Amino acid sequence: MSTDWKDLPVAPWLIDTMEQFGFTDMTPVQASVIPMFAGNKDVIVEAVTGSGKTIAFLVPLIQRMLNLLKEGPAVSGRVYSVVVSPTRELARQTYEVLQSILEMGCPEADASDKITLEKKKKGKAAPTMPKKIRGQLIMGGDLPSHMDLKNFLRDKPQIIVATPGRLLELLRAPQIKTSAFDSLVLDEADRLLDLGFGRDITSIINILPKQRRTGLFSATITDAIQNLVKIGLRNPVKIVVKVGGKKEQKTPLSLGLSYVVLEPREKLAYALNLLSIYPYRKAIVYLPTCAAVTYYQQMFSHLNEGREEPYEIYGLHGKLPSSTRIKILNKYQKTGAQAILMTTDIAARGLDIPEVDLVVQLDPPSDADTFQHRCGRAGRAGRQGQAIVLLHKGREEEYVDLMRVRKVKLRPYTGPGSELEGEKLDQEATELYTKLRKWVLEDRQRHDQALLSFVSFVRFYSKHVAQSIFRIQSLDLPGLAASYGLLRLPKMPELRTKDNERPENTWLGEVIDFDTYSYKNPAKEEARLKELEAHKEAMKNKVKIHKTKNDVQKANRAWSSTLQKKEEKSERHQKKQTRINEKIKRDFEEAKDLKQEESKEVVNDWKDMVKKSKKRKVDLPTFDDL
C-alpha cells in the first residue's frame, strides 16, 4: 500500500494542497480509505483516534464533487454531499478544515476538464462552471433554521457539514431536492449513537436516495453501528487500521500513555508542577465536572500570576452557550502562547486541535473508551505526545490492569516533573494548601465554588462505572477536600460512611466564623447580610412563639381542672403503691410457707434416718456370735 499522495486518483491541486499543509505522506487510514471512497465503494472505517480520518473523507468528497461538476453546474435546492458530525464543535472544526483546503487550492474551474476543452475547440458554449466548490456549515445555535435554508438556496453549496437535528430540518424543507445526492459521511458514528441521534440518523438515511456512496468513520465499531450498517450501506468495504500492525495496540505509537499514583492531597501540587516543567506547546487538563472546570480555571489563573512566563488558561464545558464554547476553542487553537485548556469530556472526541503535546487527566473518566479518546487529543497525525492520568493510592491502582484488559498499556510516568515525590511532594502539597486556603478566605464566592466542585466530584465518583475500583468508602475525603481548598467537609449523603474519619466538627483547619466570612461582591455581600439577619430574627421569633404558646396554655387552664388532675394523679399513685405492697406481702407469705414446709421435711428426714440406723444396729451380728 503506497503512502505517496501522488499515487492517488485525485486532482493534482488536491495533492499540492496536502503537501502545502505539511502532509508529506499519507497516514495508513488515508492510504486505505481515499482510493476506495473516491471510487465507488461504501466504506466502514475503524481506526485509532488521531489517525487522520478527517482528511481521509474530505479528500474523496471533494474529488467526487469535482467529478459531478464536469456534468454541469450546481443547481439551487439540490443536496449533493453531507458530513454528519455529533457535536457543533466537531462540525465547525470539520468545516474549517474543508474551507482551508478549498481556499488554498481549489481552482475557479477545472482547466483539465476534457469536455470543456473539446466544446471550446468546436466553438460551442462551454458549460457554466461555478467559481469553486463551496461548503456550508449547518448546526443549531448558530443561525435560525430558515436562515440556513435561505443561505443554502442562495449559495448552492456542494458539501454540507451539519449536526443531525438541523440537517434533518433542512432535508424536510419542500424546496430541497435529493435526487442528485452523491455522498454521505457519518463522522464519529459511535458517538452519534451514544448521544441519542440514532433515530435522526435513520430518518436522514431514509430521506436520501439509496443510490449513493456512504462512509462510516469511527474509533470503535459497536453492535449498534452494525445495525446502522445494515440499513445505510451497500456491500461496504470494512477498513480496520491497526497501528504498527499490532492487534493489541489501541493508540498511536507516537503517543505515550503513563500514570502517576498519588495521595489525594498531593494531586493538585503534582499537576501544577508538571504543567510548569513539561515542555509543551499546548496542554489539555481533563476534569470530571463542569463545576470543577470553572473553579480550577480560576484557581490556576491565580497560582499562575507569580510565574515568570505565565501560560494562558482557558475553560470549556457543556454548560456554556454554544457561541461561547466556539469562541473559547478558537482562541485556544489560534493563540501563539503556551496554553492550557481545562475541559470536561465535551472536548474528548473528534476535536483536532493542533500542537497539543500534553494531556493530563486529574481523574479517570467513567468508561475506558472515553479514556482513549481523551488521550488521543495529543500525538495526532504522527506528532509526539504524552498523556498522563493521576490515580489515588489504593484501589485506583487496579485501573492500570483494567486498561490492560482493554488493550491499553499504561506505564509509570518517568518524564519531566516525575522527580517530585516523597517528602518534597508532601511539603509542596502542604504549602499549596496554605496558599489556597488564604486565597479562598479572601472571597466567600471562591469557597462556594470550591464546595460545589467538591460535591459534584463526590457524586461523579460514587456513580463510576467501575465500582469495584472507584469506591467512595476507600477515598481519603479530608485530603481530597484539602486539595479543593475547602475549609470544612460538607454534609452529604455520600459521606455518611466516612463519619469516623472526619476531623472534629468537620473543620479541616482553623475554625472560621461563617457569619463574618464575606463576599467581595458588594451586592452579594449585602444580600448575605440581609439573609443572615432574617435568619437570626426568625430563630428568635421561633423561640419566643414557642414560649408564648406554653404560657398561654398554662394561663388558659382552669383551676378546677388543674386540681382534678392532681387528685387523679394522686389516686393513681396510691393504687399503684397498694398493688406493690400487696405483691410484697403475698411474696413474703409464700416464702414463709415454703420455709415451714422445708423445715418439716428436714425433721421427718432426720427421724427416718434415726429409725433406719437403729434397725441396722439390731440386724448386724456381733463378734461373739461368730
From Swiss-Prot:
Membrane spanning stretches: none
Signal peptide: none
One Pfam family cited in the UniProt record for this chain: DEAD
Motif (Q motif): 3-31
Superkingdom of the organism of origin: Eukaryota
Main subcellular localisation: nucleus
Keywords in alphabetical order: ATP-binding, Coiled coil, Helicase, Hydrolase, Nucleotide-binding, Nucleus, Ribosome biogenesis, RNA-binding, rRNA processing
rRNA processing among keywords: yes
SUPFAM superfamilies assigned: P-loop containing nucleoside triphosphate hydrolases (SSF52540)
Amino acid composition bias (Basic and acidic residues), ranges on this chain: 579-611
Subcellular location: Nucleus, Nucleolus
Disordered as annotated region, ranges: 549-626
Span(s) of short sequence motif DEAD box: 187-190
Annotated ATP binding sites: 47-54
Coiled-coil residue windows: 523-604
Domain Helicase ATP-binding: 34-239
Record's keyword annotation contains Electron transport: no
Protein's GO biological process: rRNA processing
Sequence similarity: Belongs to the DEAD box helicase family. DDX55/SPB4 subfamily.
UniProt note: domains: The Q motif is unique to and characteristic of the DEAD box family of RNA helicases and controls ATP binding and hydrolysis.
Function: ATP-binding RNA helicase involved in the biogenesis of 60S ribosomal subunits. Required for the normal formation of 18S rRNA through the processing of pre-rRNAs at sites A0, A1 and A2, and the normal formation of 25S and 5.8S rRNAs through the processing of pre-rRNAs at sites C1 and C2.
Name of the protein in question: ATP-dependent rRNA helicase SPB4
Lineage: Eukaryota, Fungi, Dikarya, Ascomycota, Saccharomycotina
